[in-house]
Amino acid sequence: RRSKMEKGIDAYIKEQFHLPPVDIRTYSPLTLAYIGDGIYDLIIRSIIVGKGNTKASRLHQETSKLVRAQAQSEMIDLLLPYLSEEETDIYRRGRNAKSPTMAKNATMTDYRKATGFEALMGYLYLKDEFERMVELIKIALGEEEEGKEQTF
């Protein structure tokens, strides 16, 4: 028998693994970016796989186009006018965080903007604002109009 998951996936995982509640405002921007990187990657992989079964190398190639720092940097540029004050603040905190690493094949500017984008994704995920996260990703991918095919 399957049980229906009433909450967001993060709340469900915390409940199932008996994790204590945490105030996400206490998370560092890089922690938000860490979880944001994972959930954004999962969403993009789901979109790519949903477009049809193909070779793993092709799936990786298509996914990589959208998860690399340059693509995320371009996405956040498109999204800034759509962000609330709170979302913009989270993005800026992520962008301005001092990261000990840098992405391969990315400028420092793109890498920092991508970190801000990922921090925003992580923040929305941890707040169970999955619909808002998907809405922003659809805008960034050029699919904000109902039923419009993606252009990547």
Mark where each language-model region is:
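Double-stranded RNA-binding/processing signature
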Residues: R1-F152
